[in-house]
């Protein structure tokens, strides 16, 4: 499990990732050094990679898109 800070709302969200801690730390280092997220974490799906980048879960994205559609 990793934690991500959701900057937009200031909430802390969690997501379970099917990756061991050592691999996660290694790949995160590659991402932070400039590698594209999809290249650094090819074993993760789009939602999991988005969470690493933003701290936003799929449910939060869906609610944000729904609110935007209502405007």
Question: Locations of the language-model features?
Answer:
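N-terminal acidic leader/helix
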Residues: 1-30
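Generic alpha-helical secondary structure signal
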Residues: 7, 25-28, 35, 55, ...
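Acidic, low-complexity, intrinsically disordered interaction modules
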Residues: 21-50
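Short, compact, well-ordered microdomains
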Residues: 42-71
């Amino acid at each position: 499990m990793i934690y991500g800070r959701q900057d937009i709302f200031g909430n802390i969200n969690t997501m379970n990732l099917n990756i061991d801690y050592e691999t996660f730390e290694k790949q995160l280092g590659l991402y932070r050094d400039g590698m594209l997220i999809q290249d650094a974490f090819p074993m993760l799906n789009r939602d999991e990679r988005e969470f690493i980048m933003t701290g936003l879960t799929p449910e939060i994205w869906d609610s944000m898109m729904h609110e935007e559609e209502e405007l």
